[in-house]
């Protein structure tokens, strides 16, 4: 029986659909007597979480799109600090009674969180709130041609196609993050 759920989201407040679902699911699970940890990149922690039984674990890091571009690039590709902090948390929990529920990890955290879950041998559930895990644009759309993209996600044509609404370098960054 599951006793511990680690909910992962970049932010500890509602800033869109992913945040709303992550926070509301954490609260609902805690109300059912589940031991819930909310692992996030930054606050401020919303009042709903503050006034609940949910335990907050934050890396207290900034958004990768703010501040130094080099720091953001490195943090976005491999957020080693978040990986280590999550692994430390997971080591404290019974892996037979714990799951990790991921919502959003692209603005502060990174896919390095999955290295921590794999190393800790804890199962992961992902609620996809967009297509960012398979499409570098996050929406299967060619912004240059203003049409739906027909490329195989992350296939050769997809990778070389300049379809981003910004510059190709942004798409390349998002592709690198996937691997």
Language-model regions, residue ranges each:
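Generic beta-sheet signal
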Residues: 8, 39-41, 127-128
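N-terminal strand-loop element at the rim of the active site
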Residues: 2, 13-15, 28-80, 89
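Hydrophobic alpha-helical packing residues
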Residues: 25, 29-30, 117
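Short aromatic-enriched loop/helix-cap "lid" or pocket-rim segments at secondary-structure transitions
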Residues: 19-20, 48-52, 69, 112-114, ...
């Amino acid at each position: 029986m599951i006793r511990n759920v680690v909910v992962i989201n970049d932010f500890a407040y509602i800033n869109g659909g992913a945040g709303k679902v992550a926070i509301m699911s954490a609260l609902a699970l805690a109300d059912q007597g589940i031991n819930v940890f909310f692992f996030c990149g930054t606050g401020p922690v919303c009042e709903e979480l503050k006034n609940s039984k949910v335990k907050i674990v934050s890396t207290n890091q900034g958004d990768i799109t703010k501040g130094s571009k080099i720091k953001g690039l490195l943090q976005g590709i491999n957020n080693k600090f978040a990986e280590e902090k999550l692994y430390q948390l997971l080591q404290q929990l019974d892996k037979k009674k714990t799951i990790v529920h991921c919502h959003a990890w692209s603005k502060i955290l990174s896919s390095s969180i999955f290295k921590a879950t794999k190393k800790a041998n804890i199962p992961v559930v992902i609620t996809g709130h967009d297509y960012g895990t398979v499409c570098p644009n996050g929406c299967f759309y060619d912004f240059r041609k203003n049409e739906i993209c027909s490329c195989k996600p992350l296939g050769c044509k997809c990778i070389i196609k300049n379809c981003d609404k910004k510059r190709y370098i942004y798409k390349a960054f998002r592709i690198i993050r996937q691997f």
